[in-house]
Amino acid sequence: MGLLYKGSKLLNIILDSLEDQEGGAMYISCDVSNGGPVEPETGYVPNNPLFGLALDSPQQECAASCVGCLSCQGNTALPISSLTSSDFDCGGCFDPTIGVLGSQINTTPPASNLSASGSGVGNHNNGAALAGNGNSYWSTDEMASTFPGLPPLDIDPLPSLFPFSPCGASYNFASNPHQASLSYTVHPHQMLISPNGSQQQQSQSSTHPHQLQSQHMQQALTQASHGGNALHNHNSSGGNGPGGGGGSGSGSACYYEAATNAPAPPMYPSMSVNVSMNMTMHHGYGADGGPVPMQCSQMNWTPPSNSSAAVNVLYPPLLSPTHYPASATYSFTADFRAPPPTALGALPSLADKESPSPPASSTAAALGYYATGGVGQGYTPPHKSPSYQAAALSLGLAAFEDEEESIEDGDADADGEGSAGGDMKPNLCRLCGKTYARPSTLKTHLRTHSGERPYRCPDCNKSFSQAANLTAHVRTHTGQKPFRCPICDRRFSQSSSVTTHMRTHSGERPYRCSSCKKSFSDSSTLTKHLRIHSGEKPYQCKLCLLRFSQSGNLNRHMRVHGNNANGSGAGGGSGNGSGNGSGSGANGSAGAGSGLIT
């Protein structure tokens, strides 16, 4: 009893030290042969590699070559000193004719099966190298160094604390880079599988189920490109199939894909995979270049038909990953099968998606709308007489059609656009009511009301409200008259003068006074006539402050001031006063005034 008490105390120390390690413990629920479930308290397994994997095998009868396990000793004792094989591998403790349990959770399949892989690319167990490891994981020296101050563990058998056998958990810690280790967490019913050879932190155990699908699809496509067959072995429990490891194959979830046969089944974002706990991972699980944690949403371990127990480990539902590491293979989940012809027929063609060209009837209607003045009805091109058009064609006067006013008065309008009777012209002068077809013409007209003359002659300092008038005025200094009448060969310095002169030959008088019904050939003459009815006199002498209705009359009055300076103002006044007509009368009054001044 004293020795048993010491052994129990030593076991408690070992369990406490192991629970302090990272990873904690896990719970599993087992169904034993009698059908009664085992409570989680009795199924508690510490994070102790001594007892192999947490998912232990079902109970079977051991072979005669077994050196001693719980099954052989009637679940009474566990002689630790007798476990000398590689990582506590029973080394064929079960009858191979019944079905070696290592096919479910053993990582060391027979070497003969490894050589029969053929063209399969999914099963990379490397079992030959693992089975060749004949050293024990914990030697006597390591036990002494791990627990200083304690004698080597050479104790009597202890009472069994666990209702299942540690056999079959050949958990080799060899240097195979594709062999996975178990990282136990502190949460019940959760287990994290990491594809690298070391235990991972829980914070690094992010889940990427799409990588499973991506790697499987890459395997299938790669093998199909070589003309071979791809074997995706999810649980490595296949029988003697192509590329398969050892095992009974009843609980396997392998699917065999031929490169030239039926296409692969569609992948789904959240898979329910039947997996036997084979810890030697294939190339398809995770990336080879770095640790890529993986996790499935549900794992169902199905024992072979001749086994007596089953272990069902359920995991919480898996959330969709939102981030892929930089070292992972970026992929998408899709069904690579070609859609059926019916589905393709239901899709609209690209020609249907394009907007059709408008029919000829609508195009003709639109053209007719523009032709009939549906848009821009407010603008009517100015009418040109046939005689003027013929003269313009013969002389090439198109470049001078913008010269609108004469030199004598700067308020002449362009091509008759200054008439008050213009139809639907939006540019209206609010001072005199005149309308113009263009805003620039209205702006020029407003200068006549404001008296602005921004264009000045460099020779005589005479100013004008329009640039065309200044250009025509400069020609008076040079004597240039480029415009000629085709009928009487009379020449003019500006094009507007030719236009007005051509109306004298045709007799056309398009501008009519609304008061006396008198008509005129140009707009400037009508403007002068309208000032008689209105009494407007916009031109004023700066010396005597007399006002005139026409700029020509003011110019003649200024000559009088020049003559009076020479002493001939009275004679000029009497002479001018004897004239007739409104123009002569104005000149006479101006002469009389100048005589009074002198």
From Swiss-Prot:
Bias-annotated ranges (Gly residues): 238-250, 568-598
SUPFAM superfamilies, per database record: beta-beta-alpha zinc fingers
GO cellular component: nucleus
GO MF assignments: DNA binding; zinc ion binding
Spans traversing the lipid bilayer: none
Biased composition regions of type Low complexity, renumbered to the chain: 198-216, 224-237
Compositionally biased intervals (Acidic residues): 402-416
Region Disordered: start-end pairs: 192-250, 402-422, 559-598
ZnF (C2H2-type) ranges: 427-449, 455-477, 483-505, 511-533, 539-561
GO biological process terms held by the UniProt record: regulation of DNA-templated transcription; visual perception
Coarse class of the protein's main subcellular location: nucleus
Localization terms from the record: Nucleus
UniProt keyword terms in alphabetical order: DNA-binding, Metal-binding, Nucleus, Repeat, Sensory transduction, Transcription, Transcription regulation, Vision, Zinc, Zinc-finger
Functional summary from the UniProt entry: Transcription factor required for gene expression specific to photoreceptor cells.
Protein name as it appears in the record: Protein glass
